[in-house]
Amino acid sequence: MGRLFGTDGVRGLANSDLTADLALRLAVAAASVLTAGTSDARPTAVIGRDPRASGEMLQAAVTAGLSSAGVDVLDVGILPTPAVAYLTAKLEASLGVMISASHNPMPDNGIKIFAAGGHKLDDAVEVAIEDALDGTAPPVLPTGAGIGRVRAVDDAAQLYLAHLASAASEPLAGLTVVVDCANGAASALAPVAYAAAGARVIAISADPDGLNINDGCGSTHLENLQKAVVDHGADLGLAHDGDADRCLAVDETGAVVDGDAIMAVLAIAMNEAGELVENTLVATVMSNLGLHIAMREAGINIVTAAVGDRYVLEELRAGGYSLGGEQSGHVVLPAFGTTGDGILTGLRLLGRMARTRKSASVLAATMTTLPQVLINVKVGDKAAVAASPSVLAAVADAERVLGDGGRVLLRPSGTEQLVRVMVEATELPLAQKLADELAEIVGSV
């Protein structure tokens, strides 16, 4: 078997790439690795899911695998990914499992695994789980009383809502927010959390039926949210994805406020409050140059991580920093959680609006987004592209043209035979021209 884990767990077409059999065997392997050497007489695992139809099947399979390996399973039901991570720590479980494919279409699904404390797995642990899965010797499984038991955690949602309430920075009375729940895991919780903080809430795409998750809604389809914000005269729109670990925003004019702009607003707020450790924000290589410029002007440093919130988390933990995230809307506040939390991000952004009495458009204007062109180029050999003299020369030429007013990034896809060519410049035509030229050279290698 090739590499199973991607940048955010195991993901694929449910019942084809990701079968019940694979889910069960993966659960047994994960249990063997994550409970090895534990002092717990009886290991426990928290398990939750988003509402997509295949989640019931995969949760049953994972639950069977865990309990067959002697792990007691705590079923928290349909909850966001950050809630599962939080409850893994809160309930002192040995591991946590979230069944979700995040922003992917309904036919896909995925399995995200958390270690004790609610932390995402590092590469070495993922490799160990894959090795256990590939092992030729059958696992030694308990019998009788050694088999794990399964119980529902009836107050799981209330525990997570209480956590969100404790992390809210300001009362939100007087603010109106439209929240797009993507017909996903946030549907029953996000409107409650924002209302509990004092906001007037208008919820859309908050009626999951197992089939409509991410269907023309949520953080990857902002059009309905933009219209709703303008139609209702709302102060802000917030969009979550299927498992609510990300948040994008729409200001009162209907303009999109992406993850970079949200991070800029929160970084400045935390810096003013003395909460931004070492005046440092962790972003990824895909964050817009405009974020770097805005942070430099605000006296804030940026540490750059690889793409993927797990790599942002690694940098946050290594440096002890207090804020990080991605352009896609994954924002991590380590003081309140171990992974991106879309609802928490929305609460903090609304809190900044309430505290400053400034509109979302004014706050977002802290950062000017430079025009960005991204082209996906199909290639035969990603390594050959990275080492190609013609590609290296073309990148150097483009960087000379841009100077300090832009940047070039070539990034191989982690899952496909693609190289992503990204160019930012002060003017869109220049970015497009350079990106087209680079894409042609990359494609010819």
UniProtKB/Swiss-Prot annotation:
Q: What organism does the UniProt record list as the source? A: Rhodococcus erythropolis (strain PR4 / NBRC 100887)
User: So what does this one do?
Assistant: Catalyzes the conversion of glucosamine-6-phosphate to glucosamine-1-phosphate.
| Name of the gene encoding the protein in the UniProt record | glmM
Q: Which Pfam families match?
A: PGM_PMM_I, PGM_PMM_II, PGM_PMM_III, PGM_PMM_IV
Q: How is it modified after translation?
A: Activated by phosphorylation.
What stretches pass through the bilayer? none
Q: EC number(s) of the enzyme?
A: 5.4.2.10
Cofactor(s) recorded in Swiss-Prot or TrEMBL = Mg(2+)
Instruction: Give GO terms for biological process.
Output: carbohydrate metabolic process; peptidoglycan biosynthetic process; UDP-N-acetylglucosamine biosynthetic process
Report the residues modified as Phosphoserine.
S102
For this protein, the record's InterPro entries field holds:
A-D-PHexomutase_a/b/a-I, A-D-PHexomutase_a/b/a-I/II/III, A-D-PHexomutase_a/b/a-II, A-D-PHexomutase_a/b/a-III, A-D-PHexomutase_C, A-D-PHexomutase_C_sf, A-D-PHexomutase_CS, Alpha-D-phosphohexomutase_SF
Entry keywords, A to Z:
Isomerase, Magnesium, Metal-binding, Phosphoprotein
Catalytic function, reaction form: alpha-D-glucosamine 1-phosphate = D-glucosamine 6-phosphate
Family designation: Belongs to the phosphohexose mutase family.
Details of cofactor binding = Binds 1 Mg(2+) ion per subunit.
Which positions are catalytic residues?
Answer: S102 (phosphoserine intermediate)
Q: What is this protein called?
A: Phosphoglucosamine mutase
